[in-house]
Amino acid sequence: MKTYFVVGHRSGIGRALTELLLHRGDAVVGLSRSESGLAHPNLTEFQADILEWDGSGLPEHLDGFVYAPGSINLKPFKGYKPEEFRSDFEINALGAALALQKAEKALRAAQGAALLFSTVAVGQGMSYHASIAMAKGAVEGLVRSLAAEWAPAVRVNAVAPSLTDTPLASKLLGNEARAAAAAERHPLKRVGNSGELAHAGLALLDNPWISGQVLGVDGGMSSLRP
């Protein structure tokens, strides 16, 4: 049995990945700001804000680390307030960095792997995405820096999704017209789901010959122009 630390295990991609790990017999230490409602003998849960959490309760060995929290804050650039830039950065980048600091010793002890999440909007310039693209760009920089610094002991990778059908994206997919428009923007003519992103993330956690990579799982949006 392997042990994974999943930040943001309560919903969306983090929850889907947690369920995959538990289903195959792994142990999960989950941390979220509210209860997940998941019940499993191999799941240990902590309820805290990652920006304030002291790291107590982590096991001495971690085979894997997942940081799944994110934000969707889309608007014209001139409309962003300083606190919105700050919030997006804290949720997406600073939280990941602080969690990784807490987990580093245990990851090194187990020769483990870390998984973060970026967005297609970092490499594919998109209107109204300035704040999230800036924050997730920091995540990609963190991935590559730590992959170099922690090699060969710990691998670090990220998945970069496009719009995914999760609770976080419900406002963007909340009616048929919006959902159809979002699907049409993708070469594969649909949006992804949390299970598809979770399986991609699991592949990066499991493959011992991948590090420092950002894998686009985006329905072809980043590279195809049909």
Segments (PLM) and residue ranges:
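N-terminal Rossmann NAD(P)H-binding glycine-rich loop of SDR-like oxidoreductase domains
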Residues: 10, 14, 18-19
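Substrate-binding pocket helix/loop in short-chain dehydrogenase/reductase
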Residues: 76-77, 81-86, 178, 182
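C-terminal substrate-recognition "lid" of short-chain dehydrogenase/reductases
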Residues: 190-217, 222
